[in-house]
Amino acid sequence: METLSYEKRIELGNLVPALGQFKVMEKIPQYQQCEVHNLVEAPAEVPETLRHVVFNIERGQTLHETIDFLNMCPDLKNMDIIYANELDDGAVRSGNCNVAYEIAKSIGMNYAYGLEFIELVNPEDNKGFHGNALFSRWPIRWAKVVHMPEQYNWYYDRQKRIGARVAIVCSLDIGGREVGAVSVHLENRADSEGREAQMAVVYDEIKRSFAPDTPVMIGGDLNTNTFDGNDIPGFTKLFNDPERLSKHMEHVEQYERVLPQAEENGFSYREFSSIEGTRRKPMPGGKSMLLKLDWLMARGMECVDHGTISTETKDCTWAEPGSALAKFTGPELSDHNACWADCRFAK
């Protein structure tokens, strides 16, 4: 995507208090674009099962190590599609590079990328772009960005930004068959009803874009905290009550409407998603709260197997000697684990 000067970014950001995020986004062509880059040839044959992976990459701050993770992890050797969240393009914190392109090039996949936020804090950012992506070893026929209803205005956050949460809706060509693939990132600074309202827009777009019998997979960080992300005292109290926290994590669907909402729209999530926690939320005292935020949900598909892959450095024992990952001394590649599901088309 074409860059905007830092001065232009600030000029546009200054309009947000008067106009609101969406009116300002209308003035920025990059928000109407969805980049699609088909970089590799399609596989010669369609396997019996396809491996779908959901992974919040946490901006790409450990880019080289993350590329090693994707290339070397035994559970990711035959992945077909990655539903990826939080990828920078031109931000100092991730080396001022295009994270989605670097990953796609290094792991041999096609990709689609959509802009979620323009960061306004750091004048050293070449672009300050931040968004979601979908990686596929199958050709991407088309892709579009879906802007979801605002549930939190990030302009007034310490991470001052222009933008809103997005979904990337893609049509894939898998051996001549159309398959829908949707990468979603819902708002963490919201409650259950806010996230439900965001997903409603995604389901509306799926209905417009695909025939009812087209298989579709949705994957991403749905931020199913089971609490309002703005309620700091509330989730601190939850963290300090292990029995209650365990109940929340065991029965996320009782606290987060997006899960029963999926079933109401013909999508299954129970057999496709991890029963383990997927995100380590930092808490006071160096502790963390393990949450179930990352999900895969599908229609027209059956799950054969699924699992979760730790992104904590201590668990990457399979890293090849001498690689960036093997040399990495940080505690984790991302604050999210990666989740996968092997799926076949329903008969």
Which residues are covered by each model-predicted region?
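Short catalytic/ligand-binding loop motif for oxyanion handling, primarily in non-cytosolic enzymes
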Residues: 61-63, 90-93, 120-124, 128-131, ...
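Active-site beta-strand/loop signature of hydrolases that rely on acidic residues for catalysis
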Residues: 50-57, 70-96, 135, 170, ...
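Acidic/histidine-rich helix-loop elements
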Residues: 24, 43, 49-68, 88-92, ...
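Structured beta-strand-rich core segments of catalytic domains in phosphoester-bond hydrolases
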Residues: 2-44, 87-178
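Stable alpha-helical elements in mature extracytoplasmic
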Residues: 62, 66, 99, 103, ...
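A generic structural micro-feature
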Residues: 47, 127, 160-164, 287-289, ...
